[in-house]
Amino acid sequence: MQGTADLSTSKLGTKKYWDELYALELENFRRNPQDTGDCWFSDSDAEQKMIDFLVDNIGAYRISENASVVDLGTGNGHMLFELHQTEFQGKLVGIDYSEESVKLASNIAEATGVDNFISFQQADIFSGDWKPGKYDIVLDKGTLDAISLSGMKINGKLDVVDVYAGVVERILKKDGIFLITSCNFTQDELVKIIETDNLKMWKTIKYPVFQFGGVQGATICSVAFVKQN
């Protein structure tokens, strides 16, 4: 498994970086309401593929039009806004540890008239004081990637990557689905990081495969897991 020890720390893993980025994006949005900020992995169309995956699998496990959905590391909330435009009309919640992210996403929700359907909360998902409740679907689009670059230790000992699956298990209902997209980890690495006795790989999303130096691979991967108990 590629753990955090194998990844260099980066400013992308710091709260300061994201606070400054989303503060700037909020300022830009206030000047121009059409500018809602960047969409991660847009070059791979990952967000739309994740949404299409959920729509295509309605009826499987806890995936339904009324499913409760939480987006970990929601950023500007773009994925939830897009998801709300589909069949999904259940409780949609975005979580981020950046206060500026929550301000930006909340402002966009209010300006677009969906603040009664989508809510955003600032939280440290690794804190024992966090009381998130449980959801039918948990989403992650690049959040584990950013977290893995932070160099953070839980209780000064455990890498955040090593406890991430426990966070997901904590907030996911039985038969719930965790859908994650990553550019830092391969599909096999994600399975090793996320799979537990209760969380098992279910399906994957296909992306274009490239060949370089005789080796085939994709620049991004998305894996869905189901919580069995």
Curated annotation (Swiss-Prot):
EC number: 2.1.1.-
Deletion consequences: Defects at both very early and later stages of endocytic transport in cells.
CDD domains with a match to the protein in the record: AdoMet_MTases
Entry's Gene Ontology cellular component terms: cytoplasm
Molecular function terms from GO: protein-lysine N-methyltransferase activity
Catalytic activity: L-lysyl-[protein] + S-adenosyl-L-methionine = N(6)-methyl-L-lysyl-[protein] + S-adenosyl-L-homocysteine + H(+); N(6)-methyl-L-lysyl-[protein] + S-adenosyl-L-methionine = N(6),N(6)-dimethyl-L-lysyl-[protein] + S-adenosyl-L-homocysteine + H(+)
Alphabetical list of Pfam families matching this protein: Methyltransf_31
Single Gene Ontology BP annotation: vesicle-mediated transport
Localization of this protein: Cytoplasm
UniProt entry keywords in alphabetical sequence: Cytoplasm, Methyltransferase, S-adenosyl-L-methionine, Transferase, Transport
Family: Belongs to the class I-like SAM-binding methyltransferase superfamily. EFM4 family.
Protein name per the record: Protein-lysine N-methyltransferase EFM4
Biological source species: Saccharomyces cerevisiae (strain ATCC 204508 / S288c) (Baker's yeast)
